[in-house]
Design a protein with these regions (language model features):
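Lumenal/extracellular ectodomains and adaptor appendage modules
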Residues: 2-294
């Protein structure tokens, strides 16, 4: 166990270390102990269960830090990589957007398009960034206009820690230093959208874009075409851009979607109504005059 600091790490002594057994159906603690003065620990499992994996966790400054899963069946000794814990701070350090990937699908039968975004959020400081309340997230970013049906996806940041408010996606999960944390979410673009814009509201080191409509036109600063990529028997035009600055725009000119006869219904009704009105006026003009009564 190690305690992370601004420039180095030190042993985390006397920390309570818990080993958990995890399967697809359930998870729970198996055993625990305290780390020694050098931050080391040794937990003996007499009958390791090979039906799942084991993870080691440690609590520090109100947060749990968890190791990578290890398989315990059939091996007398398993090494677990060091877990590095950090002190927590509110409103700092800043969280950087290291990479953004957006995948834009073809229109559905309803004319809407599904977009999946994967972001990599990076904490370059020496403490774990946490939130004070539900009003001040640990990170926030703009989402495109003419979109809806937002939902969080799988990644390092749980969907339960993601909120969508007005024109923004908000993250309330703690973000620790080290490797960038992956955030994913999806949404639908309104039917009939011809120009789809990804707004850039903060410095973005790199952006990758996949567009299933390979005839779409993409405009962005420092844009490079990466050819066509095949993913699960679907073909996408690939692009990269960056670095990007606040105020930059990624514009995608989309081709017209599928023809939907129901989209013409309002116009058909209007034409029929106009035709009926003309017929009524014509009929009134053609109606013979009333016969006069003779005295």
């Amino acid at each position: 166990m190690l305690l992370g600091r601004a420039r180095d790490t030190v042993p985390l002594a006397n920390a309570r270390v818990v080993i958990h057994h995890v399967t697809r159906e359930n998870a729970g603690p198996v055993d625990s102990m305290r780390s020694d003065a050098r931050g080391r620990y040794r937990i003996e499992l007499r009958n390791p269960d090979s039906s799942g994996a084991y993870v080691v966790s440690v609590w520090y400054d109100s947060l749990a830090y968890v190791s990578a899963p290890v398989m315990g069946g059939g091996r007398p000794l398993v090494h677990v990589d060091d877990i590095i814990a950090f002190a927590t701070t509110v409103d700092a350090p800043p969280i950087y957007l290291a990479r953004r990937l957006a995948t834009v699908a073809r229109p559905s039968d309803a004319g809407t398009r599904e977009v999946l975004e994967i972001l990599e959020l990076e904490n370059r400081g020496g403490t774990t960034r946490v939130t004070r309340d539900t009003l001040r997230p640990t990170w926030a970013g703009r989402i495109p206009q003419r979109t809806g049906q937002f939902r969080g996806g799988e990644g390092d940041i749980s969907p339960e820690a993601v909120r969508f408010r007005h024109d923004s996606v908000l993250v309330f999960a703690p973000i620790a230093p080290g490797q960038p944390k992956q955030l994913s979410y999806a949404y639908s673009v309104a039917a009939g959208t011809r120009t789809f814009v990804l707004p850039i509201d903060q410095p973005t080191a790199a952006l990758n874009l996949l567009v299933e409509d390979t005839t779409a036109t993409v405009r962005a600063p420092h844009l490079e075409s990466r050819g066509t990529q095949a993913i699960e028997e679907r073909h996408f035009a690939a692009y990269s851009a960056g670095p990007l600055a606040p105020g930059d725009r990624i514009e995608i000119e989309l081709p017209a979607g599928k023809f939907h006869p129901q989209a013409l219904l309002p116009y058909v009704i209007a034409v029929l109504a106009a035709g009926m009105l003309v017929a009524l006026v014509w009929a009134l003009r053609r109606r013979p005059a009333s016969p006069r009564l003779s005295a």
